[in-house]
Amino acid sequence: MRIGLYPGTFDPLTLGHLDIIQRAMALVDRLVIGVAINRDKGPLFSLEERVRMVETECRAIAANGGEIVVHPFENLLIDCARDVGASVIVRGLRAVADFEYEFQMVGMNRALDAGIETVFLMADARRQAIASKLVKEIARLGGDVSSFVTPDVGAALVAKYR
C-alpha cells in the first residue's frame, strides 16, 4: 500500500489545498493529511477546529475512492512521515518563491531519511494566488472569500472575525 503525507497548517483549509488533496489521491492508496501544530504561526483556528475542518471538507473526496486520514503532528515532518508509514511527502507549489523554500526542505528531509521521497504538485492555475494568510486578511477586513474557500470554511472565518 502506497501511503502519502500531505502536511500543512491548513489555517484555514483553502480550495487550493483541496485541489492538491484530490490530485494526490490519484498517486497513493492512503493519503494522510498532517495538520501541523505550529505555534510560531499563531493560528487563527485551534488544532481541533483545523482537524475538524479538514475531516469535514475531505469526506466528499474520500467518497470517490481511496482513504484519507487526518493526523495532527508537532514533531519533525520526516518523523511524522515515518510515524504514519508514508513513503512519499506531497507538497503543493504555487510560485517560484514556494520552490525555493521547498527545495531546501527536500534537501534536509533527504538527509534525515533518503527513503522518503517528496513529490511536488503544481497549483491549478485558478488556485495559484490562494494563500491562507491572504484569505484570513480578506476575511478580517470583511471581504468575500467565497472564491478561495468552501462555504463552511467561509462561515467559520466570518464567525472568527465577528
UniProtKB/Swiss-Prot annotation:
One of the GO biological process terms: coenzyme A biosynthetic process
Keyword list, A-Z: ATP-binding, Coenzyme A biosynthesis, Cytoplasm, Magnesium, Nucleotide-binding, Nucleotidyltransferase, Transferase
GO cellular component, one term: cytoplasm
Pathway: Cofactor biosynthesis; coenzyme A biosynthesis; CoA from (R)-pantothenate: step 4/5
PANTHER family cross-referenced by the UniProt entry: PHOSPHOPANTETHEINE ADENYLYLTRANSFERASE (PTHR21342:SF1)
Catalytic activity from the UniProt record: (R)-4'-phosphopantetheine + ATP + H(+) = 3'-dephospho-CoA + diphosphate
Names of the cofactor(s): Mg(2+)
Recorded name of the encoding gene: coaD
Protein known as: Phosphopantetheine adenylyltransferase
Molecular function terms from GO: ATP binding; pantetheine-phosphate adenylyltransferase activity
Family under the similarity heading: Belongs to the bacterial CoaD family.
InterPro entries linked to this entry: Cyt_trans-like, PPAT, Rossmann-like_a/b/a_fold
Residues the record marks as site: Transition state stabilizer: H17
Free-text function comment from the UniProt entry: Reversibly transfers an adenylyl group from ATP to 4'-phosphopantetheine, yielding dephospho-CoA (dPCoA) and pyrophosphate.
Pfam annotation, one family: CTP_transf_like
EC number of this enzyme: 2.7.7.3
Highest taxon, organism lineage: Bacteria
Natural source organism: Cereibacter sphaeroides (strain ATCC 17023 / DSM 158 / JCM 6121 / CCUG 31486 / LMG 2827 / NBRC 12203 / NCIMB 8253 / ATH 2.4.1.)
Location of the protein in the cell: Cytoplasm
Subunit and interaction comment: Homohexamer.
Residues that, per the record, bind substrate: T9, K41, L77, R91
Amino-acid positions noted as binding ATP in the UniProt annotation, renumbered to this chain: T9, F10, H17, G92, L93, R94, E102, R127, Q128, A129, I130, A131, S132, K133
